[in-house]
Amino acid sequence: MGSRLSQPFESYITAPPGTAAAPAKPAPPATPGAPTSPAEHRLLKTCWSCRVLSGLGLMGAGGYVYWVARKPMKMGYPPSPWTITQMVIGLSENQGIATWGIVVMADPKGKAYRVV
């Protein structure tokens, strides 16, 4: 599926016939529950500018979603169920995009919750 440009270029390069590569040694299976890459998790925890940038981006996206849903209501149109859903997704306490941005900035690793 997709165009040829969306596929990686390496998949179209073939080795000349007669030169076979040695089979690669498969990686050991990951243990369940173990993080796949420690560097991935460490970056968001230690890089304050990364947290601020991603948090503000999410807060801006949530505000935009709310604003787009609110704009027809300001013009006098009655709200539809989809409009209310957009407003909830934009700024809701539990599942909103803007709230997600606040959590990324304030508590990126979930240290505020006790793990039992």
Curated annotation (Swiss-Prot):
It is found in: Mitochondrion inner membrane. Residues 14-24 have a biased composition (Low complexity). GO terms for cellular component: mitochondrial inner membrane; mitochondrion. InterPro entries: DMAC1-like_dom, DMAC_Protein. Keywords: Membrane, Mitochondrion, Mitochondrion inner membrane, Transmembrane, Transmembrane helix. GO terms for biological process: mitochondrial respiratory chain complex I assembly. Pfam families: DUF4536. It is a multi-pass membrane protein. It comes from the Eukaryota. The keyword rRNA processing does not apply. Residues 1-39 are annotated as: Disordered. The chain crosses the membrane at residues 52-69, 82-104. Required for the assembly of the mitochondrial NADH:ubiquinone oxidoreductase complex (complex I). Involved in the assembly of the distal region of complex I. Interacts with incompletely assembled mitochondrial NADH:ubiquinone oxidoreductase complex (complex I). PANTHER family: DISTAL MEMBRANE-ARM ASSEMBLY COMPLEX PROTEIN 1 (PTHR36469:SF1). This is Distal membrane-arm assembly complex protein 1. It comes from Homo sapiens. The lineage of its organism: Eukaryota, Metazoa, Chordata, Craniata, Vertebrata. The gene is DMAC1.
